Amino acid sequence: MTKAVNPFKPTAGMNPPELIGRDTVLDDFAEALENGPGAPDRLMRISGVRGTGKTVLLNALGDLARKKGFEVVDVASNAGFCNRILEALQRNVRLESISISPSILGVSLGSMEMSKSASHLGEAMYDAAKRGGLLITLDEIQDASTEEMRELGNEMQLLIRQGANVAFAFAGLPTSVDGVVVDDTLTFLQRAKHVELTRLSDFEVGGSFEDTMRRAGKELDKGAAELLTKASAGYPFMVQLVGYYAWQVAARSGAESVSEEAARKGIQAALDSFNAMVIAPALRRVSERQFQYLAAMAQCEGVDIANGDIAKKMGLSANKVGSYRKRLIDAGLIEPRAMAVFRLQFHTCAIICWRPFERTNKEWAVRAVAGAVLVSLSQPVTSGGDYGLQMLQVEMID
């Protein structure tokens, strides 16, 4: 008998077995491609905190476009992405008349070099659009330089004005996506359809767990489904992560179904993995003062927290903490909710709670924003703000 293969794919950007809760977005985009140039949903800006499935949605848009005969170029927004788009078009259609200047192969692109590159890029984009259509997807927009974004945006706007068969979708953290559309030279992107990815409902998540496992050859006990749904906290990445490890636990025992016990063990393994992959690397990029801001937020009551209350917890004035707050917003760790009110958004579903309990130690806890996942860990803290993150161990708390 053929061994059932684990259907869950908890790898960043990899397509899951089922795309949950995005049907309307995909239907609107497919119809826009069918309706031709000028359809509003051909321009799309996708925002969301980490773990909400932005890259996966871009992949799905690309799959739809390919099925309709479009050429699709997917790029990340780090330095040199305009040149990478051009290189991809050259590879795909063998545009021998276009040559890439060695001066723009590096990371640093001067304004003169960029103008030359953009001229060739526009020609390549127009040629691809004439043949069968062109979709460009741009991911991690927070990494994009303003200059390159303007160059690509200007070329795209010109093609749209010419009635070319093009589409453009870009994704990133909420503040970075908002920052792009308010740029004076990219105002046309304000008309792009805004898709804000939020947490999935428990109903959607629970149904997906059951359907995915059943199609792959395992049943899911009712109690196990409830545990996995709660642990995922509505985040697509966590759905894949806890589903993957719960399946593995059941598979190793030779079970034909995923029991509550397998779900609990799988959730614990997923939390360990989540800590190593997501939490610890994120905290390494947070300065001591920024972490104190996060810790102060975690000690405040409620979910949406006033900046004044955070500053008070830190023993500082509200104006004094402004720079820490801005960096945390830019990093996607906290989210503005209203005037001077903020919400913790620690990567996918975790926030940091901190409280001292000994002179030389601090107790750390990580919990979901909605309280769905609660784990704790403790670690000695050495001088110099070294939190010993490489040695963190996570345990489930009921």
Q: Where would I find each of the regions flagged by the language model?
A:
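Conserved Walker B catalytic segment
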Residues: 115-175, 182-185
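Walker A/P-loop nucleotide-binding motif
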Residues: 41-59
